[in-house]
From Swiss-Prot:
Belongs to the G-protein coupled receptor 1 family. This is Vomeronasal type-1 receptor 105. GO terms for molecular function: pheromone receptor activity. It comes from the Eukaryota. Gene3D superfamilies: Rhodopsin 7-helix transmembrane proteins. Residues 39-50, 116-135, 210-239, 293-311 are cytoplasmic. Putative pheromone receptor implicated in the regulation of social as well as reproductive behavior. The chain crosses the membrane at residues 18-38, 51-71, 95-115, 136-156, 189-209, 240-260, 272-292. It is a multi-pass membrane protein. Residues 1-17, 72-94, 157-188, 261-271 are extracellular. The lineage of its organism: Eukaryota, Metazoa, Chordata, Craniata, Vertebrata. It is found in: Cell membrane.
């Protein structure tokens, strides 16, 4: 049995911190998802980004729930899992992580489209129906599920196995070593996907920052520097997306650094625990970014609380 996990589930501080992070993330994403469902049921006017925001909260919620279940095999002495459970859980977890990346990228691009002026070539996409967004998300989902399909073959249950030839994921689940050709092919596909989506995020973020800076200069020129113009809903939404994308890129860099160090030191439980914690910060914090920065969400939640208190 691998030493790092046996040491991890005996450390109550690491275990409690990790499950506290998961609990906070599940609660926040559930709240944001329920708000979007409530908004849809009440027939309120939806924005172009409402569907991706609701979908992102659902994906993060499912990923965190899946993480909590998988973590029982990492931090808690648990009965053994068979191949089917290992393959299903880890494949779904990796799929949800990929979908979170795809949806975040789509959200960034859509917000750039919303903020674009009428003279921009992106303005024609503002009034596209929501089923175009659904098709884009579905296409990205199918593509990523195909890229991750090798996990259904390479993930196996490894009870009472101590060899270092396997990449241990949890106490009972490991990844079989692949041939150099297969490993290179899937690594290249994943690298192309990540570089493309993150580059698209960076470009759309840079475009939004440029538009916001230009708008601020124009507003100051028209109203004078003594006045502080009130931010429009589109600008507030853009700032929340910018915060979200900055957090995502930062967490991706940290995850890459920790993952590289874990590759160098396979039996180091400290780097493994850091990776477990860091990789889920984005899914935990992202709903708070929307809840805090979007005034209509805060006002709606406040009115709902008042109604509940008056019942």
């Amino acid at each position: 049995m691998m030493n790092k996990n046996s040491r991890l589930y005996t450390d109550s501080n690491i275990r409690n911190t990790f499950f506290a992070e998961i609990g906070i993330g599940v609660s926040a994403n559930s709240l944001l998802l329920l708000f979007n469902i409530f908004k849809l049921i009440c027939g309120q006017r939806s924005r172009l980004t409402d569907l991706p925001i609701g979908l992102l909260s659902l994906i993060n919620l499912l990923m965190l729930l899946m993480t909590a279940f998988i973590a029982t095999d990492t931090f808690i002495s648990w009965r053994g899992w068979d191949d089917i459970i290992c393959k299903s859980l880890l494949y779904l977890y990796r799929t949800f992580r990929g979908l979170s990346l795809c949806t975040s990228c789509l959200l960034s691009v859509l917000q750039a489209i919303i903020l674009s002026p009428r003279s921009s070539c992106l303005a024609k996409f503002k009034h596209k129906p929501s089923h175009h967004i659904s098709c884009a998300i579905l296409s990205l989902s199918v593509l990523y599920m195909f890229i991750s399909s090798h996990l259904l073959v390479s993930i196996i249950a490894t009870p009472n196995l101590t060899t270092n030839d396997f990449i241990h994921v949890t106490q009972w689940c490991s990844i079989l070593p692949m041939s150099y050709l297969m490993q290179s092919m899937f690594s290249t596909l994943l690298a192309i996907r990540d570089v493309f989506l993150i580059s698209l995020m960076v470009l759309s973020t840079w475009y939004m920052v440029a538009l916001l800076c230009r708008h601020r200069k124009q507003t100051r020129h028209l109203q004078g520097t003594s006045l502080s113009p009130k931010a429009s809903p589109e600008q507030r939404a853009t700032r929340s997306i910018l915060m979200l994308m900055s957090l995502f890129v930062l967490m991706s860099v940290f995850d890459s650094i920790v993952c590289s160090s874990r590759t160098m030191y396979l039996n180091d439980p400290i780097s493994y625990s850091y990776q477990l914690f860091m990789v889920h910060i984005y899914a935990t914090v992202s709903p708070f970014v929307f809840i805090v920065t979007e005034k209509h969400i805060v006002n709606s939640l406040r009115s709902m609380c008042v109604k509940v208190m008056n019942v």
